[in-house]
A protein has these predicted regions:
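Compositionally biased alpha-helical segments
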Residues: 1-198
Length: 198
């Protein structure tokens, strides 16, 4: 599966939520035509990719090619199985999410114009992470921060997982981090989204 030109945008539905952004297959973007069960299909001709369980209980995937106004909807569906280990969604102003095969439900291809893509001006000079740390005893310390000993600039990323869904979030998009327990923390983003990551 591959785009003919440029990047491909989509909305991914998983067992834990819906994500919208630039789509990558199996941790890499496809940019050339690829054979699939002896059928050549460009990604920009695909409308949906959906997951279902095969006879052996494993997740497999089917494709529904894009329907043009002159097509007969009855002929629109082609059941082509395609192995997908994961789908990564690069979301502007949030970060990237990697959805595993087990938690993937559906991908819908959308026009890239529906995304608010970042421009060169959205990437200023690197800034140190600044903030406040509140201890369990109530003490507050303010200044430059180094998260996990080595992340000290806003362009560096916080890596976390929830089940088998992986997140990579630049610190510039994070508002606060609060411990939930010894395994997970609550992450609040600047757009007010909240995540529980371990």
């Amino acid at each position: 599966i591959a785009p003919e030109t440029n990047q491909v945008a989509g909305t991914v539905k998983s067992t834990q939520g819906i994500y919208k952004g630039i789509i990558y297959w199996n941790s890499q973007q496809r940019q050339s035509q690829e054979k699939m069960n002896q059928i050549n299909i460009f990604l920009n001709k695909i409308k949906k990719l959906y997951a279902f369980k095969g006879k052996n209980g494993n997740h497999t995937f089917g494709l529904i090619p894009l329907v043009s106004p002159n097509d007969d909807p009855a002929d629109a569906q082609i059941n082509v199985l395609y192995p997908v280990e994961n789908i990564t969604i690069n979301m502007p102003n949030i970060g990237s999410v990697c959805v595993s095969r087990a938690q993937f439900e559906e991908l819908t291809i959308i026009p890239i114009s529906e995304l608010n893509l970042l421009s060169y001006d959205d990437f200023p000079s690197p800034q140190a992470i600044k903030g406040e740390v509140v201890t369990r005893s109530g003490q507050t310390f303010a200044g430059n921060l180094a998260y996990d000993l080595d992340e000290s600039y806003e362009f560096e990323v916080l890596d976390g997982k929830n089940n088998t869904i992986s997140y990579r979030i630049p610190f510039r998009y994070i508002r606060s981090i609060a411990p939930k327990n010894y395994k997970y923390s609550f992450i609040t983003l600047r757009n007010n989204s909240q995540l529980s990551l371990g």
